[in-house]
Amino acid sequence: VGLNTYVTKEESTESSSEEESKTEVYSVKTDDIKSLEFIIDKKDTVFEKKDDSWVKKDETAFPVNQTTLDSAASALEKVEADRVLENVDDLTEYGLDSPSNSVTVTTDDGTTKFNIGDENTSTNQYYIAKDDEDSTVYVVSSSTVTPFMNSLYDYAQGEDFPTIDSSTVKKVQVSQDEDSYILEENSDGATWDVSTDGSDKETADTTAAGNVTSGLGSLAYDQFVDYNAEGLSKYGLDKPYATITVDYQEEVENDSSDESESDSEASESVTEDDTDSTEDTSGDGIDSTASDDGSSGDSSESEAAADSSDDGDSTETTTVDKQLVIYVGDNADDGSRYVTIDNKQVYTMSTDTLSAIIDKKASDLWSLIVNYQSVKTLDQLQVTYAGDTHTVNVSRETSTDDDGNDTETTTYKLDENEIDSTTFTTFYNKLVNMAGQKRLTESYTPAADAEMKVVFADTDNNQTTVTFYSYDTNYYAAVVDNKVFLVNKMTVKEMFTAYETLVNGNAKETETPTTTAEAE
């Protein structure tokens, strides 16, 4: 115990001694600082205080990040040296013969200049010299120096990328030289169509469409590059690598005072229209819906009221249609890409994030489901296999029990003989839930006759034909109209086996009809 107490006292004494040995080099109240001048990107740069805000002296429009400059000023509030080297003859040993930076602090009392030399990476310290005291070198913590060692746009206040709720995305259009597509949500709100130019639409894979929309919801800026780009060509934005146009929706709260004012203005407008119905309202073509974040809104679509509590208070919201256009330019040095949404401010954005949206063809988003036909709407199924053709007819009958509950009974007949519903739906599920591993985009000519041909007829008398050909050792080609899906050979053979079981082992003359569930 005695030894431990001694060691603890010794450590405490050493720590206290180190604190006492620190030498104050400079102190200032941050509120007294009028300007800071230091080198940024090899240029002398001055930030000065005007009306309690930092501005860039030679470029007052520059969007200075006030927090960053306040932090830099705070680093000088009390500059202390861990060591003081006096009577230094050779400044080259400390990198002070040609300083990497210099920081000049101006107050009402005058100016103080610090030259910054080399960094001692092993101790996380810098060598600095104050004013023109060339023979004295101070060793200070890196926290005193690093706030002044950044690039210009590290001192800029950028904007956040507009928030997109991926669940509200209605349409995505990507325009590139070769890889362009249009992805559109269907009216059911659950499925998507994809095309190259808006025509010849194909059903989109739900997961692939979800990856695109979730990618949009994840977009964020990396680095702020230019707040007022006059030459977009240096970022490749005069002729963008890709243009992304997103139609989405946003819920906004209505301000009650704004609503009252709007209602009043609307009333006045109606009066004016009644007074002069011949006034020209054709407009000059200017889009008055454009917003500062690069998106446009139309709040005329729909309105909804949401109760916020049980005391009768409610918040009225409006569903606003928005459109955001994102221009994607060249690669930056770090591998990211330059982007802009207003052709003025330029940022970088991760290529990993963008890759969820760009560099895709419409075919990359195609659904690979060969042909889904719900059993609830199936009327007839005709199958030709191994030289024989069999037909399954579906009939439905609704009965009502004593309590008034309706029950639908579905009966399946194979060539006029009733068959077990479970055996049929086992085969049918394998048939309609079949997915290809890829689709051929080039023309296809079968090398042999079809091994199976299936004709679907639904309750609306629509017919679809699916034909299966052996493609190679790994795949069958499932052909639907002009679409050719390559399906794993084992998947197709399992379906063939289920069909053989249906035909060879389960046909029967009579069976009590059973209620069946939807085929998955």
Enumerate the predicted regions with their spans.
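Soluble, acidic/polar mature domains that operate outside membranes
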Residues: 1-520
